[in-house]
């Protein structure tokens, strides 16, 4: 029995649109297409309820590192009036609660089938429809396919010799089960990225012993997750329109005024003063983009910021040998990290740091992990905080086939492409939320921006009577080239990072983001619309059978 009551406008289709995902992107897409445009929409998600990445990532310490008042949708003024955030950043349970409120308020669940994974989607050129295949055996047809698969959702689980012999429990932060108790356990954590920092600082105080297996030392500033009183929240709500106007015209969309002052021309004393103030305030993105404007582009400025953090590591960590292991040797040019007393963790008697770049993991044993030196760490639980096959991971894992049976896997075999971070050549009526070469920002504002453009494009195509729409090769390649040129203007490509796919063995290094900021991105995609979608191929002649 259909879960829909609306009439499908597309002749011969089960639905006008299928939306994959029930995170920030999927929920907003269902709202825009169903509630505002009146299309018949079916949503799918492999989780049991709404939440997307925040449904799966329930590990200890999980939270956003974005100001609470902008880690949400900007359109939900009614929910905003009711909203109450306790601290500067939202925890995972708070974010999930908010997303449930959104789903209830907009009546979104009735369009979804949960606990249902989409295995593949094939475009039928004769009908002009997508055939969407699920793991339940159901196949449905739709004119439009909108994917909110998640920027960071395809979990990366490294392969180690002997892993099946380990008698303890193995967990991944990206698929955290309920009821896990780490207290009084010997815990090993592999990975020290954003998630690793959070789970390390949350686990250290409760574990019997914590061993951190570090491949790359990280630059980590304090998180500064301060309580928010009623007066502060009232001021944020009163200033909401101005805040969001700034966010939508900013670079990283994190809710703070980005600096316009270069560190390169500042005096050493001024740099020290600004960096110290940012350290006390907390926030990874604020430290990189709110202090000076050239930390991500100038070697001189980057060195100054890196040296400041290195000095803090030396000051905080009591054991000089441990401090040396924790001190990064590369540029300060990865995703900016922040944590709750991260470096202080390594002063605890129950915490051991294993430098697995110098002494790699050789194998898992029944009782723990053995390094190549022969040193063995006995463990009850091993946690993989090893991140994700970011951006394109879920797309190449899914059986996506476009015009002529071309697969997304083959299209992106030399690296992910994508037009505006939302479309791809030979994949008609196919729209990605947070696809390759989209903006490198706080995600909810970028998601909103993309979903609104997708909805506007679909609306325009429906009004014009267009059967299918896709980008030209020239437009796609020009956009990819623009993203590469912009990335090369920064220092980010010089650091080994998941931003370019470096965390996945065998994955080719590729530019996967538009790094000129959300303001410039919004202008770029608005221009496509204002110019009459001349960069898109619009076909009115699909054969009906």
Swiss-Prot record:
Q: What is its EC number?
A: 1.14.13.-
Q: Which Gene3D superfamilies match?
A: FAD/NAD(P)-binding domain
List the residues marked with site Transition state stabilizer.
Answer: 335
Q: Please give the cofactor(s) recorded in the UniProt entry for this protein.
A: FAD
Residues reported to bind FAD: 24, 45, 54, 65, 71, 118
What biotechnological or industrial uses does this protein have?
This enzyme offers a promising route for the synthesis of chiral ene-lactones, when expressed in an engineered strain deprived of enone reductase activity.
What keyword terms does UniProt attach to this protein?
Answer: FAD, Flavoprotein, Monooxygenase, NADP, Oxidoreductase
What does the similarity note say? Answer: Belongs to the FAD-binding monooxygenase family.
As a miscellaneous remark, the entry gives: Displays a different regioselectivity from P.lavamentivorans BVMO.
> What is the role of the protein in this entry?
Catalyzes a Baeyer-Villiger oxidation reaction, i.e. the insertion of an oxygen atom into a carbon-carbon bond adjacent to a carbonyl, which converts ketones to esters or lactones using NADPH as an electron donor. Besides cycloalkanones, can use cyclic alpha,beta-unsaturated ketones as substrates, leading to conjugated ene-lactones. Can also act on methylated cycloalkanones and methylated cycloalkenones with high enantioselectivity in some cases.
Please give the name of this protein.
Baeyer-Villiger monooxygenase
């Amino acid at each position: 029995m259909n879960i829909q009551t609306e009439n499908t406008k597309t002749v011969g289709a089960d639905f006008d649109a299928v939306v994959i995902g029930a995170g920030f992107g999927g929920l907003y897409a269902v709202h825009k297409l169903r509630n505002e445009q009146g299309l018949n929409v079916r949503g799918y998600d492999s989780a049991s309820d709404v939440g997307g990445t925040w449904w799966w990532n329930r590990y200890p310490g999980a939270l956003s590192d974005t100001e609470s008042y902008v880690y949400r949708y900007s359109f939900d003024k009614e929910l905003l009036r009711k909203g109450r955030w306790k601290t500067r950043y939202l925890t995972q349970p708070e974010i999930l609660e908010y997303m449930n409120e959104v789903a209830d308020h907009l009546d979104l669940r009735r369009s979804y089938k949960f606990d249902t994974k989409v295995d593949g989607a094939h475009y039928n050129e004769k009908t002009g429809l997508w055939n969407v295949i699920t793991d339940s055996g159901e196949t449905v047809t739709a004119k439009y396919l909108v994917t909110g698969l998640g920027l960071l959702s395809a979990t990366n689980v490294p392969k180690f010799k002997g892993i099946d012999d380990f008698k303890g429990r193995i967990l991944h932060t990206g698929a955290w089960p309920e009821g896990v108790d780490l207290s009084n356990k010997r815990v090993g954590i592999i990975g020290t990225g954003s998630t690793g920092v959070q789970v390390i600082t949350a686990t250290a105080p409760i574990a019997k012993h914590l061993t951190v297996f570090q491949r790359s030392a990280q630059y980590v500033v304090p998180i500064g997750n301060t309580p928010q009183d009623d007066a502060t929240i009232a001021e944020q709500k009163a200033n909401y329109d101005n805040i969001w106007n700034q966010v939508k015209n900013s670079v990283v969309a994190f809710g703070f005024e980005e600096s316009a002052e270069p560190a390169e021309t500042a005096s050493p004393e001024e740099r020290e003063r600004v960096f110290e103030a940012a350290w006390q305030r907390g926030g990874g993105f604020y430290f990189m983009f709110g202090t000076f404007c050239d930390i991500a582009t100038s070697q001189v400025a980057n060195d100054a910021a890196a040296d400041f953090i290195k000095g803090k590591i030396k000051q905080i960590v009591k054991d000089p040998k441990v401090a040396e292991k924790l001190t990064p040797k590369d540029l300060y040019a990865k995703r900016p990290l922040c944590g709750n007393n991260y470096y202080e963790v390594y002063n605890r008697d129950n915490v051991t740091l294993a430098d697995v770049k110098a002494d790699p993991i050789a194998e898992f044993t029944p009782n723990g992990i053995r390094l190549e030196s022969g040193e063995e760490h006995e463990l009850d639980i091993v946690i993989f905080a090893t991140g994700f096959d970011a951006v394109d991971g879920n797309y190449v894992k899914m059986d996506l086939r476009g015009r002529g049976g071309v697969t997304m896997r083959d299209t992106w075999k030399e690296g992910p492409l994508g037009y505006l971070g939302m479309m791809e050549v030979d994949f008609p009526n196919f729209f990605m939320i947070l696809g390759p070469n989209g903006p490198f920002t706080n995600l909810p504002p970028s998601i909103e921006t993309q979903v609104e453009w997708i909805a506007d494009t679909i609306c325009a195509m429906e009004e014009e009577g267009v059967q299918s729409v896709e980008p030209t090769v020239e437009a796609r390649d020009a956009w990819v080239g623009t993203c590469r040129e912009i990335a090369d203007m920064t220092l980010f490509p010089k650091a080994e990072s998941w931003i370019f796919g470096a965390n996945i063995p065998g994955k080719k290094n590729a530019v996967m983001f538009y790094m000129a900021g959300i303001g410039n991105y919004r202008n770029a995609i608005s221009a496509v619309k204002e110019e009459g979608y001349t960069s898109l191929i619009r076909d009115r002649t699909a054969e009906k059978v």
